[in-house]
Amino acid sequence: MDPSIIEFIGEKCMISIIPNFSNEPLHLIYGPVGPFRAGFPVFVPLWMATHLRKQQKCRIVPPEWMDMDILEEIKEEEKRSKFFTKMPCEHYMVVAQLVMSTAPDDVPRCEELRTVIKDIFDIRESKLRTSIDAFIKGEGTYAKLDNLTLLEIHSVRPILPYSLDHIARYQRTATASQRDTSMLSASMAGSSSGPNSNSLFSQ
C-alpha cells in the first residue's frame, strides 16, 4: 500500500476543533459534520481540521492520547513487553504528524511529544523486524503480529518478499524431505516382506 493511501485513510480520523466561525452542518459523503458554533468544540475529520487550521478558522484540540504521561507509559510498556502494545489510535503516527506540523502552537510540549512518539514508532519497528527475523530463523509457519498499524506494516515491506521466499523454499524442502522419507519407508517395508528378508539371520 502506498504511503499516500495510508495517510489518506488516517486523515479520516475524527478530531476535535474549536472553530472561530459559525456555520450550519456540512453534508459530506459519509454523513454530516457540524453544526459549527464559534468557541464551541466540534468533531471533524482530520483533513478538514488541518484545512481549517491553515486558514486560521479554528484551533485544533489534540487527542487525549497526545499527552506526555500517557505516551511515556506506552513507551515503557512497549519496551517491557515482547508483544505489540495496542495503540490508542490505529493511525497514531499520521494523526500526530499532521496535527503537530499543521498546528504546533495548539499542542502543549509539542517537541517532546514528537520525540516520544518517534521513540515508540522506532521501538515497535525494531521489535517487528526482530519478530520477522526470529520467524524466519525458526522456520515458523505464522507470526503473532497483533496490534500493528498500517504504517508499521508498510515500514517492513522491503524485507517481506525475502521472508516469504525463504519460507516457501523451506516448505518445499520440508515437503520433498517428507516425500523421500515416505518412499524410503515404503521401499524398506517392501523388502522386508520378500522371501529372503530373513536370510541374514537364518544361517
UniProtKB/Swiss-Prot annotation:
One of its GO terms (cellular component) is CMG complex. Residues 179-203 are annotated as: Disordered. Keywords: DNA replication, Nucleus. Its main location: nucleus. The keyword Repressor does not apply. Residues 182-203 have a biased composition (Low complexity). SUPFAM superfamilies: GINS helical bundle-like (SSF158573), PriA/YqbF domain (SSF160059). Gene3D superfamilies: 1.20.58.1020, 3.40.5.50. Belongs to the GINS2/PSF2 family. This is Probable DNA replication complex GINS protein PSF2. It comes from Drosophila melanogaster (Fruit fly).
